[in-house]
Amino acid sequence: MSLGLVGRKVGMTRIFTAEGDSIPVTVLDVSDNRVTQIKTVETDGYTAVQVAFGTRRASRVTKPLAGHLAKAGVQAGEILKEFQIDAAKAAELSSGAVIGVDLFEVGQKVDVQGTSIGKGYAGTIKRYNFSSGRASHGNSRSHNVPGSIGMAQDPGRVFPGKRMTGHMGDETVTVQNLEIARIDADRKLLLVKGAVPGAKGGKVFVTPAVKTRAVKGAK
């Protein structure tokens, strides 16, 4: 139950420390997270904040959503996202408020959720890193096949969960414990250490890390 930010993946680059070390980072644009609704236990049964990100023409918004946004005095966005928070945090926010990059700080660990790049229909070698068959020595037409998928007459079926060919990618993926390497407050950018799922321009959700790793040897 933590407040987060909705953003857009700009791409990857690298930054350098004072010692000259190169750090690969992903640049995230988290500008203009506008609060559209505060949900409370009394009105909705739980406590949450709904935010809008990006911009969208008014003509591309349904009338019910247009009324919802007009009530909050917020411009239409590309996406609406809800973050469940506690009542104390919800009391600090109001409809129409803007949540900025100051929500996070340099060195903080965050979880970033995005949609992985779709690969289409893929075989088991690409999808699950299976080994291919022999190129020769009697193998004529079984170079990239997965092999046997079942058993004999008993049990006479393919077990659920068997790794086979199928659609690969285009899934919701969360990368945990990424460190914020730098914050550009003027351009409203977060630079997180490491890779983030999705293609350039893809939507991402940034929240404080849930499973922070303990430092070995720390008391």
UniProtKB/Swiss-Prot annotation:
Region spans: Disordered: 133-153
Pfam families found in the cross-reference section: Ribosomal_L3
Q: Which GO terms describe its biological process?
A: translation
Q: Where is the composition biased (Polar residues)?
A: 133-145
- What's the family? Belongs to the universal ribosomal protein uL3 family.
Q: Partners and quaternary state? A: Part of the 50S ribosomal subunit. Forms a cluster with proteins L14 and L19.
Q: What name has this protein been given in UniProt?
A: Large ribosomal subunit protein uL3
Species of provenance: Paraburkholderia phymatum (strain DSM 17167 / CIP 108236 / LMG 21445 / STM815) (Burkholderia phymatum)
Give the source lineage, highest ranks first: Bacteria, Pseudomonadati, Pseudomonadota, Betaproteobacteria, Burkholderiales
